[in-house]
């Protein structure tokens, strides 16, 4: 090959080597395209939460209150032997 063609080919290769990642990054980082890409290729889809954090904490507090009252009643009913 002639040296001029080799230089042109090398310039083309380096242009593609540096240009493609830049163009791909600009293309993918568009917020609408990024959201579409993420939604299209989801690996794990979680179901919506059954209860909110507040509901969960409320139920947890109710459970602990019931448990402590039950334990207190059991302790009161047990005969004390000294």
Swiss-Prot record:
Lineage of origin: Eukaryota, Amoebozoa, Evosea, Eumycetozoa, Dictyostelia
Biological-process GO terms, alphabetical: mitochondrial cytochrome c oxidase assembly
Protein name: Uncharacterized protein DDB_G0276777
InterPro entries per UniProt: Pet100
GO cellular component, one term: mitochondrion
Listed Pfam families: Pet100
């Amino acid at each position: 090959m002639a040296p001029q063609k080799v230089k042109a080919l090398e310039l083309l290769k380096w242009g593609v080597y540096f240009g493609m990642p830049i163009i791909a990054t600009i293309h993918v980082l568009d917020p609408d395209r990024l959201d579409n890409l993420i939604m299209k290729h989801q690996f794990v889809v979680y179901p919506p939460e059954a209860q909110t954090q507040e509901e969960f904490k409320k139920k947890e507090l109710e459970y602990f209150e019931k448990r402590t009252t039950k334990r207190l009643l059991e302790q009161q009913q047990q005969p004390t032997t000294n």
